[in-house]
């Protein structure tokens, strides 16, 4: 990199404009070098060296070098000699005595110049005594001073500081260690104690650069080690661990450097907005989001490695150094293992290398013994070594297969063993397919965890179905799961359900074959293997049917029941489905989804018990609903004649698609209306099917659906289901199932205002404003190609249209307005939001009440794609 050394700048070059120009030249040279694959370590160190030279030249320019007993000192990361493009430049002006006023004024000019150069300078002016006093009270200051490095000025003054900082009385090694451990715990807690955050902080997230810094700070305080290499020389790290940490740090530095050259202000968050550019800078490429996903996979794997090393090394340090090697007495388990306190440890130094299947033995002991929480640090180090040296996957060892199946069948393995097996890399060492999904992310807002983390969480959620305390949250699963004859089949399906992701093609089909082969290899019968592979192949079937199909249509239930075939499969599938939803995103599971799945489960159960050759009698269901609703209405004082006159105006479909309680509620308010010319808007005070039911009864008008959903969208409410019906005399009876932004029923306190505003827009007569709010920030970084598909159906009267698009504000309203403008009738809608994607189903008829023709479908597709494009953020 060709640029002028700051030490050679003459006084005429020390203006703000000239210095800015030189800094820009240096920054551009570094950027080009990085993009040309120059080693990032050289760039990080050379930036610090450049700043050393610049600050030294300016120090001399202001005449500070002629003043005795003051020093310019680099502290913190700059003290380590590490600077990224936007890193803070932390400096300390150190003096033996308090500075006179004129010198403070001059120092102020010096600092102001640095700020004028747009350098992120953090500074302090202190005496040695002040540093000692503040450092003893403030852990951050103490840590920064520990990394102090003299730039220029008085060597003696700097050495006085070093004597204070290195003295045991400043921060005793054990006290410093305990404080740093607590600081790390608190930092990890801010990131939910997981390395898997969608927009991670490269520096502070668990497994990030701060975890490496913590290791170096602790080692520096105790040994005086000033680098990772020195830490290995003191025996704090093995050579292999040293190389691994250097490799991890190098990758994290490259990610951070790539991020900083894209930003204008200091930030270490790898946001969606910048993941694309960072991936490109690091050479990760692929179709669509493949490059981003490859980069983030490497990133998450690196965080895992750092987090594991950090935890192990700090525990080893605690055990061997802080506690002087003293340990609790060992309790012998067998010839291979013993328990020490709440930790299990191997009794032989090369046990796992000699007999790799004993790795699984260790987890069987953990599952068996509730007093064991984890693995001892020396045994963890042995496990890591054995893991790296394995020349084949564990599942190829017959004894290991037996032990794995013993674990899968163990009643305590779910909550005691599997999460730890994943965390310690044993599942990846056992199963090659699992090793491929470790760190595999999906660039979207729906999947908040990597594939491996999601799968482990799914296993943990299955375990919750064992406890009666969770019955209210998961009534069906808590009833069904305990009676499953072979729970291990469900667990194997959970392990394999997403194992095909990231390899191209349909992950369900990939997983289906691999699950079957795994089951046969592990001694399961063919029927058992077929059940597991069927669950993997169809693990999305129940969720998709419940959320994106009309489950009140007998045809839909019959088709679903045909695919499920029997109640055993249905029971396994509902447990897998619920656990899958809960493990995908903590905010996904709500009363609405619980109700949908329950209705699908029980409708299918009834169909299977009745026999698929005996479909439900629609007329009988209508009569049943009418009888029950009529009884409720008569209790309210209405006569049979009043009820009959009203119901003669309604079509049969209304009585089929509503419960008797809904019918009675609607009709009671319709019969009490003073002015039928005015709209009627009702909102259920109690949650109905897990949400708030909004019922609209009014004379039909153009784009009424669009008008209602636009108003609800304006108030940040989400429509999840709509039944669009009309009476024989031109009135609409529309029902909307609505949730708030948190997936809950709308607060009753808001009902009055919502009804008032809906009444207003329904009587206003002005054109609908389809987009009523700005596109959320996060959605602006995602692209979803708009797709309009027309689904096959046996119905000759209705068309099923599926829409996939970016879930931008106004989408539902513009879709409804398009239907109205083209003269099509909307009869129902199922609204599903999957992160940034909307996947909606609409039931349509043409203007004359029949199915849409192929030409009409083509015109509708073109019009929708055009209109939705107009909404683009």
Swiss-Prot record:
The keyword Transferase applies. Residues 333-692 are annotated as: Uridylyl-removing. Uridylyltransferase (UTase) activity is inhibited by glutamine, while glutamine activates uridylyl-removing (UR) activity. GO terms for molecular function: [protein-PII] uridylyltransferase activity; phosphoric diester hydrolase activity. HAMAP family: PII_uridylyl_transf. It catalyses: [protein-PII]-L-tyrosine + UTP = [protein-PII]-uridylyl-L-tyrosine + diphosphate; [protein-PII]-uridylyl-L-tyrosine + H2O = [protein-PII]-L-tyrosine + UMP + H(+). Has four distinct domains: an N-terminal nucleotidyltransferase (NT) domain responsible for UTase activity, a central HD domain that encodes UR activity, and two C-terminal ACT domains that seem to have a role in glutamine sensing. GO terms for biological process: regulation of nitrogen utilization. Its cofactor is Mg(2+). Residues 693-773, 800-873 form the ACT domain. It holds the Pfam family NTP_transf_2. Signal peptide: none annotated. Keywords: Hydrolase, Magnesium, Multifunctional enzyme, Nucleotidyltransferase, Repeat, Transferase. This is Bifunctional uridylyltransferase/uridylyl-removing enzyme. Modifies, by uridylylation and deuridylylation, the PII regulatory proteins (GlnB and homologs), in response to the nitrogen status of the cell that GlnD senses through the glutamine level. Under low glutamine levels, catalyzes the conversion of the PII proteins and UTP to PII-UMP and PPi, while under higher glutamine levels, GlnD hydrolyzes PII-UMP to PII and UMP (deuridylylation). Thus, controls uridylylation state and activity of the PII proteins, and plays an important role in the regulation of nitrogen assimilation and metabolism. Residues 1-332 are annotated as: Uridylyltransferase. SMART domains: HDc (SM00471). Residues 451-573 form the HD domain. Belongs to the GlnD family. Transmembrane segments: none annotated. It comes from Vibrio vulnificus (strain YJ016).
